[in-house]
Amino acid sequence: MTDFILNAQARTDLGKGASRRLRHSLSIPAVVYGGDKEAQSLTILAKEITKLFENEAAFSHVIELNVDGVKQNVIIKAMQRHPAKQFIMHADFVRVVAGQKLTAKVPVHFINEEAPVKKGGEISHVESEIEVSCEAKDLPEFIEVDLGNAEIGTIIHLSDLKAPKGVEFVALAHGDDKAVANVHAPRVAPEAEGAAE
């Protein structure tokens, strides 16, 4: 059972024009795919999906998708937002199959950021989410990055993070030890340098 529930209707009217008409009627087009079933086009009320994804945890939890009374467990795979107005324009969901691994992007939470700042450093958040591979039951709500011991010059890579049990960082599994955050000395503006001379 999941805390996140989303209602949808099957959609047969497809194409750009149909999607535009849907958005004008305060609904959005979506698709669900994966598992051993065919992809299915959906219609979801814009206010319902917007409310669901106001909670950051919904991005990294299993969602119960109720399509015309038929329930299935899914995760969000992709979401398209309007570039200027930020409302949701389209969503892709992937069915969750028990015992099978899935990939999902999980938000990064940085803690103890004040420690390097007190030492005169500035923090750059290089990644705001990390792609993980795991079974749905092991999907973490977020990945925690502790900056408490970071100094100026510290670069925190994926390999520096402890993955929760049953969870693998996808990039690291492919040999890409990405930087997640770094601490650097404050940059001095060129005008400030000139004024100091």
Curated annotation (Swiss-Prot):
InterPro entries assigned: Rbsml_bL25/Gln-tRNA_synth_N, Ribosomal_bL25/Gln-tRNA_synth, Ribosomal_bL25_b-dom, Ribosomal_bL25_C, Ribosomal_bL25_long, Ribosomal_bL25_short, Ribosomal_L25_dom, Ribosomal_uL5_bac-type
Protein's GO biological process = translation
Q: Which SUPFAM superfamilies match?
A: Ribosomal protein L25-like (SSF50715)
Organism superkingdom: Bacteria
Cellular-component GO terms for this entry: cytosolic large ribosomal subunit
Q: Name one GO molecular function term.
A: 5S rRNA binding
Q: Which UniProt keywords apply?
A: Ribonucleoprotein, Ribosomal protein, RNA-binding, rRNA-binding
Entry-linked PANTHER family: RIBOSOMAL PROTEIN L25/GLN-TRNA SYNTHETASE, ANTI-CODON-BINDING DOMAIN-CONTAINING PROTEIN, RIBOSOMAL PROTEIN L25_GLN-TRNA SYNTHETASE, ANTI-CODON-BINDING DOMAIN-CONTAINING PROTEIN
* Family per similarity comment: Belongs to the bacterial ribosomal protein bL25 family. CTC subfamily.
What does the protein in this record do? This is one of the proteins that binds to the 5S RNA in the ribosome where it forms part of the central protuberance.
Which HAMAP family does this chain map to?
Ribosomal_bL25, Ribosomal_bL25_CTC
What is the annotated quaternary arrangement, including any partners? Part of the 50S ribosomal subunit; part of the 5S rRNA/L5/L18/L25 subcomplex. Contacts the 5S rRNA. Binds to the 5S rRNA independently of L5 and L18.
Protein name as annotated? Large ribosomal subunit protein bL25
What is the species of this protein? Answer: Pseudomonas putida (strain ATCC 700007 / DSM 6899 / JCM 31910 / BCRC 17059 / LMG 24140 / F1)
The gene designation is rplY
